[in-house]
Amino acid sequence: IADTAGVPLYIVHVSCEQTHEAIRRARQKGMRVYGEPLVQILTLDESENINTDRNHAARRVMSPPFRSKDHQDSLWAGLQSGSLQVVATDHAAFSTEQKRAGIDDFRIIPNGSNGLEERLAVLWTEGVETGRLTPNEFVATTSTNIAKILNIYPKKGAIVEGADADIVVWDPKISKTIS
């Protein structure tokens, strides 16, 4: 429909291989289709939702749900090849107490997970440090690509003369525990 209307299509929460493959095929045909997996989906798998600790499992309720490692491998490959462009978080944090409200009925557990604070560090650790992404692919998936998609590049998404000085400085060697 988007192609017929001549507009781009931006697909959020890409979590499975089939969706990634549909985006890849559409892009191969020249369609302006973009895919955005979440950092949580790239790094946590379906075992999070079946954990015997009900509080742990409740804290992981989000949509779409976590998938198997096979799906994660496809998404990482998509980021490497450029068939997926941006990594986001869909940050929707809730306290353990809020998540516990639906402990006896998962349908009323608040849907969402944190991720904004951790996105860069987790993507660097699980992407660059494992060899799944190069440092340039990391920058592209966190900054450059979205600026291009939103037609604000090179004013945003690049470190060049005349661009806004939006820079994040952080030490990827610092370690902390995410709970």
What does each model-identified segment do?
Residues 1-87:
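Histidine/acidic residue-rich metal-binding segments in metalloenzymes
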Residues 174-179:
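Short, Lys/Arg- and Gly-enriched loop/turn segments at beta-strand edges
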Residues 29, 171-173:
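Short acidic-glycine loop/turn motifs at beta-strand connectors
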Residues 3-6, 59, 81, 85-87, ...:
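His/Asp/Glu-enriched, well-ordered alpha-helical/loop segment
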Residues 15, 38, 92-93, 168:
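Catalytic metal-binding/acid-base residues of hydrolase active sites
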